[in-house]
Every structure is written in C-alpha cells, then in structure tokens.
Amino acid sequence: MDKIPAVKVYQPSYFSDHRGDLWTIWKEGDHDLKFNHDKVSTSKKNVLRGIHGDNKSWKLVTCLYGKIYLVVLNTVSKKWGSIVLSDDNKKMVLIPPTYGNGHCVLSDHAVFMYKWSYEGEYPDVEDQFSISWNDPTFNIGWPVKNPILSQRDEKKH
C-alpha cells in the first residue's frame, strides 16, 4: 500500500498452538475511531466483490478464513495498492473515507470482515460509489481473468 499512504496496514499480535489461533481484531484505544457496524462476507474462489466506497466511512478489513487479494484505490490520485489478506498472515487494513476497495478470493472459500466507523446513518448502496473492477483508468492487476461478479458489479463492467 506504499502508493497510497493514507491506507494503513496492521499486523496484530496473535497466539497459535495445536488447537488453532487467537488474535484481536480491535480493542478500544487502538484507533481514534468509534466502530459502529460490523459486516462479514463469505465467498468462494474467483469471486470478486467491488470496487465500492463512500465519502464518510472508515473501514477496518481482514480475512478471517481463507485468502483474498484486497485492492484499495484513491479516486482522486487514481493510484491503487494491493495486499493479500489471509487467516495465515492475519493482516488488517484501515481504509479511509473516499477510498474504494474490492477483493478477489484466492482460496476455495474465504470469510472477510469489515468494521465500519461513520457518523449518522449507514451509507447503504445508494450512498456508495462503484468503480468497475477492470476500469482502464486504474489498470488493476487482478489475479483472476474471469471473476464471478454480482449483478451490481457486472453493471459497472
């Protein structure tokens, strides 16, 4: 995410043993944000969600299970960055308002989590912007050529 320094990548501390893993996604005081909405998305391999964003919400995102290729883009500078998030690396990305994000599932199955922080009402679909996953303005190097898309994301194609 070097090309877009407003986007922050975090590596939480975690504990692993023969039973599995334990890690903290967020605790009060970690960020100067009040998170007020959580969402979880499950998808299969080659599903591409996004690119979506809005003008008022911060998003802390992570992959709880599986592996995804996350893309975050700055709609003003037209720069983008990418990172692989997985249950192995446990990395998290904090995305500021006005930035778009999308992800493609690399594993057979993935569970993706968003923590949202915003003032007022939730910025639902009508308050969000969408950018086509293959918009030539950004020339994003997605790791999949024929992604599985929602109707909403196909319309931006």
Residue ranges and their predicted role:
Residues 1-91, 109, 116-157:
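Non-catalytic, conserved peripheral segments adjacent to functional cores
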